[in-house]
A protein has these predicted regions:
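Flavin-dependent oxidoreductase catalytic cores
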Residues: 1-306
């Protein structure tokens, strides 16, 4: 099953193994470096898809010092070189993830109390997502992924632990999802109907009082209906970790999403072993499998799976 091709909208993949976005901190002032390019170049060739690590869409949304940038100062020549060096290795496609960290920045020195975003702030951020997505397309990436998971800004809207708003952007799951859907809709309109659009969605906080997995089917359906070609399901409010889950961390979420969507669903997190991966695919628990941390340590892991 891993070796069977699959498509997500216009994104044609040679197999179902994906390198998910994992930050390398290899950038200098947000610029593409040779170390960054080499990191992805070494992992390209056999794997179906690489999702390049999150890039910030505006300076206020920068998560860490070594993060890639896709704001107005983006290194377009470097990004184009990255895409070219991945593509020349063979069948691997590469998608770029775009993100806003919200209040999780490790570079902002002024830790003043966090205030609710105004409607004007939200409008500015949506436009920043749009402009970043257009830069991704211009650079030649095979698609763009909107990051709405792991405690960053968009998932802060979805989580009742971080979203204390009332009105149209708070309280109910539908309202808390609204800003995410608006970003997806605006990006879809900007990049066009045929350009592959992925969404990494944090479907459950796994914390008391947080977002609940029971809402995953409905939320996933709304994300698809808004223009998503591939749902990259995940969870956990602050980073990727879920206490007590050492394997198949988010498979239960992919299974819930599969109840209502007919676009491909990608899941990562503690999924190990070729036989087990094929079992999950055959069972319909997911359509693609992310395999990240082992590939960070040892590129040859790909040869054991494909």
């Amino acid at each position: 099953m891993l070796s069977i091709p699959i498509h997500a909208g216009k994104l044609q993949l040679a197999n179902r193994l994906v390198m998910p976005p994992l930050a390398t901190e290899n950038c200098t002032d947000g610029m593409v470096t040779e170390n960054l390019i080499t990191h992805y170049e070494k992992r390209a060739g056999k794997i179906g898809l690489i999702i390049c690590e999150h890039a910030y869409i505006e300076a206020k949304g920068q998560a860490s010092k070594g993060q890639l940038r896709l704001d107005h100062k983006a290194d377009m020549d470097g990004l184009k070189e990255l895409v070219k060096r991945v593509h020349v290795k063979g069948q691997t496609k590469i998608v770029q993830q775009i993100s806003h960290c919200g209040d999780l920045s490790r570079v902002v020195k002024d830790r003043t109390p966090v205030n609710d975003l105004t409607l004007d702030d939200m409008k500015r951020i949506k436009q920043a997502f749009v402009e970043a997505a257009l830069r991704v397309k211009e650079a030649g990436f095979d698609g763009v992924e909107v990051h709405a998971a792991h405690g960053y800004l968009l998932s802060q809207f979805y989580s009742p632990l971080t979203n204390q708003r009332e009105g149209s952007y708070g309280s109910s799951p539908e309202n808390r999802l609204r800003f995410i859907l608006e970003v997806i809709a605006d990006v879809r309109k900007a990049v066009g109907a045929d350009y592959p659009l992925l969404v990494r969605f944090g479907g459950c906080d796994y914390k008391e009082g947080g977002s609940d997995k029971k809402d995953v089917p409905h939320s996933s359906k709304l994300i698809q209906e808004t223009g998503c070609d591939l749902l990259d399901i995940s969870g956990g409010l602050n980073g990727f970790l879920v206490k007590g889950a050492e394997s198949d961390t988010f498979v239960e979420l992919s299974q819930l999403a599969k109840q209502t969507v007919d676009i491909p669903v990608l899941v990562a997190g503690g999924i190990r072993g070729k036989e087990h991966m094929n079992e999950l695919l055959a069972q319909g628990a997911c359509d693609l499998i992310g395999y990240g941390r082992p590939l960070m340590k040892d590129v040859s892991e790909i040869d054991l799976l494909l």
